[in-house]
Swiss-Prot record:
Annotated family: Belongs to the LipB family.
Keyword Transferase carried by entry: yes
Protein name: Octanoyltransferase
Sorted UniProt keywords: Acyltransferase, Cytoplasm, Transferase
Keyword Acyltransferase: yes
Pathway: Protein modification; protein lipoylation via endogenous pathway; protein N(6)-(lipoyl)lysine from octanoyl-[acyl-carrier-protein]: step 1/2
One Gene Ontology cellular component: cytoplasm
Organism expressing this protein natively: Streptomyces avermitilis (strain ATCC 31267 / DSM 46492 / JCM 5070 / NBRC 14893 / NCIMB 12804 / NRRL 8165 / MA-4680)
Amino acid sequence: MSELRFVHMGFGAEAVEYQAAWDEQRRVHAARFLDEVPDTCLLLEHPPVYTAGRRTADNERPLDGTPVVDVDRGGKITWHGPGQLVGYPIQKLPRPVDVVAHLRRLEEVMIRVCAEFGVATSRVEGRAGVWVLGDPVEQRPSLGGLSLDFDPRLADDEFDPRLNGPEYAPSNAGQRREDRKICAMGIRVAKGVTMHGFALNVNPDTSSFDKIIPCGIRDAGVTSLAYELGREVTIGEVLPVAEKHLRDVLENADLKPREVERASA
């Protein structure tokens, strides 16, 4: 992959309104498709805003009628605001496009960023984003009888069977206390070029998530670097670390197209 260009759109008092950032994403996306610009990652903070992906249900929106911006990414509803580092990597991918591989690369970036700050995180089977796993729950005694619910996860609308493998922690079916999402992700690929990306909770006011069902997941919580570390953490601290790992993972990614099995005659 070509060298990754970073654009700092605005932080703190210069946080960027969501619509303005979305317009800039689309402008850069069109330019990247035409090879007028290199692969680019927009980095910024947003003023407080709720955004809803294509699969957001009405009952997952704020109950008090707080305005929501409907966007063309995958996933469901989330919140952006001060204290959250948002990144929009706009990259050209080979065809056939492997959306899950792109998502895994972004997750790997954020896992490394959190690790550098001393916070252990993981992927969770069936769920996008980066998570702090809940503590194990004490083994409960069996009540006897036959359970025919062999895999309750498959009945969960938010369980994505593509998100699995040895790099994923097992989906939490009661064996851990509440998992906590530290980095949300939602992406879109159009014309072979990526849009949208990640939102890492550095030091936000997480009470804003209380008005919604974040990412449509009812049995998990939200956390931040500051909460997990028990100290103040700033966007300025995290920004160079994020850029380092974005470069390391995305610039060195093996972007060979997947091998596609030929149809038999």
